[in-house]
């Protein structure tokens, strides 16, 4: 099995990259792909860049170049669920765009023409992630993750997301674009991210302060998940 891993930022991939043995690096379309073995398992780690277009481009390049069997999207996220705090884990059961609106033509809010309203994560990957969470004794929430090209740092944007997606547990800027590409390629995916901030008017301050905490936690989760997927 070859496992694809996608993170947007240098801070979100550096700890995993340093753990890859026999590492080789290739740059495609402004994205960096690192291939090798993570604890003996073949992996391809992509640093995509921030935002939906960068994430979709990166996911496509990773799937075409490295041909992984599954995709894990890692990194940080803003917490929406009331039980979440910095360092906690969110696992997707579905991903949706929070900034797409074609409702004038009868689509659900967040749905694009020709696409489902949401992109479902793979049940086996979800189960494996939840098993890792239990083993590591981490606080985690599973649910809807929403994505858009905005860092949510104010009451207006937050209120809009809560209104349109009351069940959303986290918000970030890449996951749904990655899920969209995986849907088109028919490749299983799951989003496993750590909370860097609670989406509110001070979230930019929290993000800067706690990104390293989120990166450490998400790296731990992904490393454990890769082992579980490789060895059952």
Swiss-Prot record:
Q: What Gene Ontology molecular-function terms does this entry list? A: adenosylhomocysteine nucleosidase activity; methylthioadenosine nucleosidase activity
List the Pfam families.
PNP_UDP_1
Q: Which keywords are on file for this protein?
A: Amino-acid biosynthesis, Hydrolase, Methionine biosynthesis
SUPFAM superfamilies associated with the record: Purine and uridine phosphorylases (SSF53167)
Residues the entry annotates as binding substrate = 78, 152, 173-174
Which cysteines share a disulfide bond? none
Q: Does the keyword Hydrolase apply?
A: yes
| Reactions catalysed, as given in the entry | S-adenosyl-L-homocysteine + H2O = S-(5-deoxy-D-ribos-5-yl)-L-homocysteine + adenine; S-methyl-5'-thioadenosine + H2O = 5-(methylsulfanyl)-D-ribose + adenine; 5'-deoxyadenosine + H2O = 5-deoxy-D-ribose + adenine
Q: What is its EC number?
A: 3.2.2.9
- Is Methyltransferase set as a keyword in this record? no
Q: Which InterPro entries match?
A: MTA_SAH_Nsdase, Nucleoside_phosphorylase_d, Nucleoside_phosphorylase_sf
Tell me the pathway. Answer: Amino-acid biosynthesis; L-methionine biosynthesis via salvage pathway; S-methyl-5-thio-alpha-D-ribose 1-phosphate from S-methyl-5'-thioadenosine (hydrolase route): step 1/2
Q: One GO biological process from the UniProt record?
A: L-methionine salvage from methylthioadenosine
At the top level of its lineage, which domain of life is listed? Bacteria
List of catalytic residues = 12 (proton acceptor), 197 (proton donor)
GO CC terms, sorted: cytosol
**NCBIfam families for this protein:** MTA_SAH-Nsdase, PRK05584.1
Q: How does it assemble?
A: Homodimer.
What job does this protein perform?
Catalyzes the irreversible cleavage of the glycosidic bond in both 5'-methylthioadenosine (MTA) and S-adenosylhomocysteine (SAH/AdoHcy) to adenine and the corresponding thioribose, 5'-methylthioribose and S-ribosylhomocysteine, respectively. Also cleaves 5'-deoxyadenosine, a toxic by-product of radical S-adenosylmethionine (SAM) enzymes, into 5-deoxyribose and adenine. Thus, is required for in vivo function of the radical SAM enzymes biotin synthase and lipoic acid synthase, that are inhibited by 5'-deoxyadenosine accumulation.
Q: Which HAMAP family match?
A: Salvage_MtnN (MF_01684)
Q: Which family does it belong to?
A: Belongs to the PNP/UDP phosphorylase family. MtnN subfamily.
What is this protein's name? 5'-methylthioadenosine/S-adenosylhomocysteine nucleosidase
Q: Origin organism of this chain? A: Salmonella dublin (strain CT_02021853)
The taxonomic lineage of its organism, from the top, reads: Bacteria, Pseudomonadati, Pseudomonadota, Gammaproteobacteria, Enterobacterales
């Amino acid at each position: 099995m070859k496992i694809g891993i996608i993170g947007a930022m240098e801070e979100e991939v550096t700890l995993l990259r340093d753990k890859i043995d026999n590492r080789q690096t290739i740059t495609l379309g402004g994205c960096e792909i690192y291939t090798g073995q993570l604890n003996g398992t073949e992996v391809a780690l992509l640093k995509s860049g921030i935002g939906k277009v960068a994430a979709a481009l990166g996911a496509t390049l990773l799937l075409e170049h490295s041909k992984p069997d599954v995709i894990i999207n890692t990194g940080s996220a803003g917490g929406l669920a009331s039980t979440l705090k910095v360092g906690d884990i969110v696992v997707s059961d579905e991903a949706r765009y929070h900034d797409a609106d074609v409702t004038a033509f009868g689509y659900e809010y967040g749905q694009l023409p020709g696409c489902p309203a949401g992109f479902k994560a793979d049940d086996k990957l979800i189960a494996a992630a939840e098993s890792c969470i239990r083993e590591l004794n981490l606080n985690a929430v599973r649910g809807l993750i929403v994505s858009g090209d905005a860092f949510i740092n104010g009451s207006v944007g937050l209120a809009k997301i809560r209104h349109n997606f009351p069940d959303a547990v986290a918000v970030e800027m890449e996951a749904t674009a990655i899920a969209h590409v995986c849907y088109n390629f028919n490749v299983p995916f799951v989003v496993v991210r750590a909370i860097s901030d609670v989406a509110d008017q001070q979230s930019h301050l929290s993000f800067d302060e706690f990104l390293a905490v989120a990166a450490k936690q998400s790296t731990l989760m992904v490393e454990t998940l890769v082992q579980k997927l490789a060895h059952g």
